[in-house]
Amino acid sequence: MEPLGNWRSLRAPLPPMLLLLLLQVAGPVGALAETLLNAPRAMGTSSSPPSPASVVAPGTTLFEESRLPVFTLDYPHVQIPFEITLWILLASLAKIGFHLYHKLPTIVPESCLLIMVGLLLGGIIFGVDEKSPPAMKTDVFFLYLLPPIVLDAGYFMPTRPFFENIGTIFWYAVVGTLWNSIGIGVSLFGICQIEAFGLSDITLLQNLLFGSLISAVDPVAVLAVFENIHVNEQLYILVFGESLLNDAVTVVLYNLFKSFCQMKTIETIDVFAGIANFFVVGIGGVLIGIFLGFIAAFTTRFTHNIRVIEPLFVFLYSYLSYITAEMFHLSGIMAITACAMTMNKYVEENVSQKSYTTIKYFMKMLSSVSETLIFIFMGVSTVGKNHEWNWAFVCFTLAFCLMWRALGVFVLTQVINRFRTIPLTFKDQFIIAYGGLRGAICFALVFLLPAAVFPRKKLFITAAIVVIFFTVFILGITIRPLVEFLDVKRSNKKQQAVSEEIYCRLFDHVKTGIEDVCGHWGHNFWRDKFKKFDDKYLRKLLIRENQPKSSIVSLYKKLEIKHAIEMAETGMISTVPTFASLNDCREEKIRKVTSSETDEIRELLSRNLYQIRQRTLSYNRHSLTADTSERQAKEILIRRRHSLRESIRKDSSLNREHRASTSTSRYLSLPKNTKLPEKLQKRRTISIADGNSSDSDADAGTTVLNLQPRARRFLPEQFSKKSPQSYKMEWKNEVDVDSGRDMPSTPPTPHSREKGTQTSGLLQQPLLSKDQSGSEREDSLTEGIPPKPPPRLVWRASEPGSRKARFGSEKP
């Protein structure tokens, strides 16, 4: 018996995990799964002495000897990750199948199709096993599936329209949620007082709690529907922003009423504490999100040597903000939204382009997978035995949800329109009220109710599922035809060009200046103040210095400098026609506008002049938004190529004589009142005294000097001996020179020279008066022949005897 005693002494302190390892190595293959499941339980509960069969002799092993298996099946070992992978694969294949037929997602929202797939799977599971399918746990929803969706929504949210409408969004989210919660709760409590319905055991606080959770407008359902109808940006940001902040308010009200239901007596101080908790939860979540967003930006400032881990910080800090807020019982939705918006502004400038692309794709992938799993599990969890049907409670719940939602939107809009520059129209109000879709937030909160405190929990679950399915299926399917029927303004699908964005920024600065002069503190005023504070403090602290510029922009800068040097060397600058000279030559016949057209123009201006400009495209979950810097760089490169192509084409159209003259001429532009060297000043005096310029020539704004000497020719009637170069006034038509025409022009008469005046201006502005140029245009304008621009009076260095003008005769 001594060996048995030795075995007992060895077996007593043996850890259970070591026994499991021994079972895996030496146990029979067929009984491996059963051994893994039952071995710890048998070890922990067995207290009987071992049987004689278990006693082993010295030198023998405890287990029977087994051979090496060829094939082994161990499903319990990988059950959880295997099933999760299959669910995600099934959801992804379902989405691929929906989008194979392009017309199906435009008719039926994707959320409806996913719920139908979940209902089908739940029915199959319930029919085979005759048990309720596994319901999604609320902790799994709130801790793992909801954060990626909110992170994606906050990170890619158009921040400027959001902050321009922040007052209206908070008005709908806070006051509107209180309106709906209290209205639905009190109305349902009135229905419960009717004894015929059998609902007298439901108290007022329970109805208020149910009203708060049923008022949750789900951003997942809203995004799934509104991404396909492409409404205008203002309407989209109002509905989406309200649904995002509405969830945070709903969760706060839910926890508040849940705490009241668990109290035996409620005092006045508890009510004030609940109101204070309402603001603390929301503001605390925002502060946590902004703080961790700043830390993320500061961390990525030092990752320029380790680019691989840059995307990791974005997801870690955002998820850390969510779980930190939940740890302190603050609003995790507000925290992760604020963190995402902060990182979008600062982190993007620190990370590389490849890291930014990784962040975008991975974030879109996580949110799409989470959204798909939520809708499928909603359908699966619907099928089961956890329902209680009551016609009165279910029907009145649906009616009160629709009624209080519509009343709340119309009443609150009448108040907020008094403070809005752009009032919301009746069509916008109707779409906002119609877009109050319920979804996963409401579904998870109703399953989270404790059954001990709420004996009619199954009735609440049934009513919530009916409201969710009605809003997602009926309202979600019919909202697109309604938008088309009401002719609601759609989103602008055209991307802004670089010039348009420059003009938009110019208008912003102008409006900021106007507000500053008027003493009005509007959006532009506060945006300008924040930008100054951001440039002075935040960007210096959070953004890495010596940021590398885009290679395309640097290449464009080098090409422009090289092209400018070539133009200066070849004299092409002096021959390029100016906009002012072309504009003076162009005569357009403007048709008189009729009174009906004038009224139509006024109506269009009054409707669209002060509208918020469409700066971004509508949200689309299945495609990524174009990067602004990449689009601008591409446009700059395209414009550069186009300008080079036009310059080459224009240069090739010049005749050979003009090319020869421009290649040998050198022009120098001097500003007004520039002191010339003594020799040049002497020559200019001789030229003016010679009668080749008028008194107004001395007041010219710009002097163009041709420094290339021409052929020397002398006229005896002007000079008795050979004299050095002097400066003469020449008439030069820039448009004819540029277009390569050989049409001779008549030199101006002395009378016209005396009549013409020079105006101070830039190098390429016309130097003739309007009357003189107009008279010449009348003579030259004929049908089918474009008008000739007026000649241009310039200083030119030439030989005194040279009377040959560029556009004149050589007669002495």
From Swiss-Prot:
Main location per the UniProt record: membrane
Expression across tissues: Expressed in skeletal muscle, colon and kidney. Lower levels in the testis, prostate, ovary, and small intestine. In the distal colon, expressed along the cryptal axis.
TM region(s), chain numbering: 80-100, 107-127, 138-158, 169-189, 209-229, 237-257, 278-298, 308-328, 361-381, 392-412, 430-450, 459-479
GO biological process, one term: monoatomic ion transport
One Pfam family it belongs to: Na_H_Exchanger
Biased composition, class Low complexity, residue ranges: 686-701
Record field: compositional bias (Basic and acidic residues): 648-660
Topology with respect to the bilayer: Multi-pass membrane protein
Alphabetized UniProt keyword annotations: Antiport, Cell membrane, Glycoprotein, Ion transport, Membrane, Phosphoprotein, Sodium, Sodium transport, Transmembrane, Transmembrane helix, Transport
Known catalytic reactions: Na(+)(in) + H(+)(out) = Na(+)(out) + H(+)(in)
GO molecular function: potassium:proton antiporter activity; sodium:proton antiporter activity
Glycosylation (residues): N350
Compartments where found: Apical cell membrane
Annotated phenotype, changing R806Q: In a breast cancer sample; somatic mutation
Residues covered by region (Disordered): 648-701, 733-812
Disulphide bridges, residue numbers: none
Residue ranges, compositional bias (Polar residues): 757-772
GO CC terms: apical plasma membrane; membrane; plasma membrane
Keyword Transport attributed: yes
Subunit and partners: Interacts with CHP1 and CHP2.
Role played: Plasma membrane Na(+)/H(+) antiporter. Mediates the electroneutral exchange of intracellular H(+) ions for extracellular Na(+). Major apical Na(+)/H(+) exchanger in the base of the colonic crypt. Controls in the colonic crypt intracellular pH (pHi) to direct colonic epithelial cell differentiation into the absorptive enterocyte lineage at the expense of the secretory lineage.
UniProt family annotation: Belongs to the monovalent cation:proton antiporter 1 (CPA1) transporter (TC 2.A.36) family.
Stated name of the protein: Sodium/hydrogen exchanger 2
Native source organism of the sequence: Homo sapiens (Human)
Designated gene of the protein: SLC9A2
